[in-house]
Amino acid sequence: RTSRRQRQMCIRDRLYVGDYKKGELDVKIFNREWWGLFEQDNISYIRKVTLRLDKLEPDIQYDWQYRVSVDDYKNCIILFTGLDLTEREINYFTDNHIIRNNEDFTFEFGPYHTFLNSELKKTESIGEILRRDYSIYLNYKSNKKLTTQELFLFPCYGEELLISLIWAGDLDNDGKTDFIIQIPTPPNNEMGDSSGLFLSSKADSEELVKLVAYFISTGC
């Protein structure tokens, strides 16, 4: 869904369909087994895919070198490798929802009442800029018991917290919710864009989900 990426990248076990510059993409990753998460007509599904790598004529301004594509690329949300998955339709709750400060994003799944929320942790003035650090929490409520995990701290430099919840559903088929959500870019979320995949099946005993893959795009 994104056709233009920026200058510096870090890719770990996930990829987007789109164009890449020289040095941004290790073509050896094409030797791995890849899966695509798709959404069409309010149905999400996952299937094994074959990546296509086309060489591009260098652009005077951007110097794009490669184009990554798959069949049905217009409906592809993201690509994965290194995960134990099976081809199937997936129960899912949202794609491209924006989470704002002081807003709970709530949905039901099986025995769990699951919701995300934010909490302002710190406010700091940096020159004329006001930085607000928000903790982002995942919550499971079941049988009157509330279990909470802080997913990450998100520095915000605007007047309002805006985090993109790219996709939420049961990707790993364990009966609990998984997320693809915007995460802060290192070190202080000052530029660029980053997203992370959180899986419930990979969580430690004291966790609800685990960050298992991320994609970082920074630069200008």
Regions found by a protein language model. Name each.
Residues 1-11:
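Single conserved hydrophobic/aromatic residue that forms the stacking wall/gate
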Residues 3, 170-172:
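Calcium-coordinating acidic loop motifs
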Residues 13-97:
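Solvent-exposed N-terminal domain segments of exported/luminal and surface proteins
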Residues 64-143:
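Extracellular-facing segments of soluble proteins and assemblies that are Gly/Ser/Thr-biased and enriched
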Residues 138-152, 199:
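Surface-exposed loop/turn elements that mediate protein-protein interactions on large endomembrane-trafficking
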Residues 153-166, 216-219:
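Repeat-based blade/solenoid architectures
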Residues 173-184:
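Acidic/hydrophobic-patterned starts of short beta strands in beta-sheet-rich repeat architectures
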Residues 190-212:
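Beta-propeller blade repeat segments, especially FG-GAP/WD-type strand-to-loop junctions
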